[in-house]
């Protein structure tokens, strides 16, 4: 990413908004925005294989592994406004498990892009399934979207929930129910 070019574009944007980019409070804003965008879109410069393969451990277990309440934030691709919330990941290990921190890194990898929550959920699930060859993967993302809170319908307390269920999580109601119960989202 060319930070200097992005800073120049932000400077021009400020002018188009009627601001003076040379005034005291805005002098460094273009540089700061460019740095922030570089970080907030850093997911484009990584890949799941590199993240996960660093920490795969042989473990003969066929149990469900769950990481709950992984904090995440992303930028909505429609308005480039943040959405933020929590991601819950479960998988049924076959012969390998992944280091728990790699699950959080996988969430960050896909969240740090211009995103749709639906796509984010699917990308996390498919990456984990592909890399671990798990018997099943379940991912639930719950998020609040500033594009819905600050503009448009202006609904302050709305929460969007998306899920992706693959393999055993999709095929077995019992497995899916166990996962949703353990993450605290199953309601009879």
Residue positions per predicted region:
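A domain-level signal for the structural core that forms small-molecule/cofactor-binding pockets
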Residues: 1-188
């Amino acid at each position: 990413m060319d930070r200097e070019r992005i800073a120049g574009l932000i400077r021009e944007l400020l002018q188009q908004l009627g601001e003076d980019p040379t005034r005291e409070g805005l002098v460094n804003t273009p540089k700061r925005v460019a740095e922030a965008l570089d970080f907030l879109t850093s997911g484009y410069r990584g890949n799941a294989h590199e993240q996960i393969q660093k920490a795969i451990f042989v473990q003969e277990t066929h149990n469900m592994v769950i990481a709950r309440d992984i904090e995440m934030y992303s930028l909505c691709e429609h308005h480039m406004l943040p959405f933020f919330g929590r991601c819950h990941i479960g998988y049924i290990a076959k012969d390998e498990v992944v280091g728990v921190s790699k699950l959080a890194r996988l969430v960050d990898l896909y969240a740090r892009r211009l995103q749709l929550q639906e796509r984010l959920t699917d990308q996390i699930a498919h990456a984990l399934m592909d890399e671990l060859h798990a018997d099943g993967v379940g991912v639930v993302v719950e998020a609040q979207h500033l594009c819905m809170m600050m503009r448009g319908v202006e609904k302050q307390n709305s929460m969007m929930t998306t899920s992706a269920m693959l393999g055993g999580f999709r095929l077995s109601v019992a497995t899916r129910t166990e996962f949703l119960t353990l993450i605290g989202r199953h309601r009879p």
